[in-house]
Amino acid sequence: GWVVLGVVFMALFMFWGAEQLERVFGGRELNREPKMRFIGAGALVGLALVVLAIGQPTVAQRWESIATEKEAALEAREVQLQAGEVLHIMHDHKLKLVLLDVRPEADYNLFHLADALHIPLDEINMLVSDLQLEPANTVFLLMSNDEAGATEAWKALTAQSVPNVYILEGGINEWLRLFACDDTRIQAIEGEVADDQLAFTFEAALGAAYHCAEPDPHQYELEYEERLKLELKRGPTGGGCG
């Protein structure tokens, strides 16, 4: 909105400047010019102000416009990558894997996957412009302790046209169930754990220093359904004027 308004005023200023030059150097009598040009200028400014008032669609509004299609993909488990596929992608040099951990900082400090970036869920939208500049072979993998937080982040990024965004199926808890069973320093919490809460205790906050942060793919034979489908690179979403 502000960009449109600025462009309109810049254009009007240039037209006004051109008229003044013609008046000074060309002897043009502006008082004899049609008054309709003022009406036209006013209409342009009015239109720009309307655009400014309407503003840019919010992330929630953008999501609503695609919710039917994307919710179906979530329900069909098309965007939740299983641990076996993620482990394969980690070692696929044709792809650039960007791991985005949206859990609380305390959980991230206890344990996180190797090279995972800590991005608080309420700050995920600030990252959109940077993510859209990544190469076309980039895969973005969101993770939370289960899937709730990662799903919210996925909706936000998908609504803003960030391509190739996926969710770690089962979250960090499922990852630890698969790869941390031989590490006595990591123990499963007995009983029920609240949704999207860490279901394990750790001897120390070692972050990615635990071996299960980057498992050796040759030590595991995990069956998985291939769900990764690279999208063609798309430009940043405008979401409206402004």
Regions found by a protein language model. Give the residues of each.
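A contiguous, mid-protein "functional segment" used to position or interact
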Residues: 163-206
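Second-shell loop/turn segments in exported
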Residues: 70-74, 114-117, 139-145
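A short, well-structured beta->alpha microelement
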Residues: 81-88, 102, 115-129
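Flexible, polar/low-complexity N-terminal or interdomain linker segments that lie immediately upstream
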Residues: 2-98, 102-110, 188-242
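Catalytic cysteine-centered active loop of the rhodanese-like fold, especially the PTP/DSP P-loop
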Residues: 1, 122-178
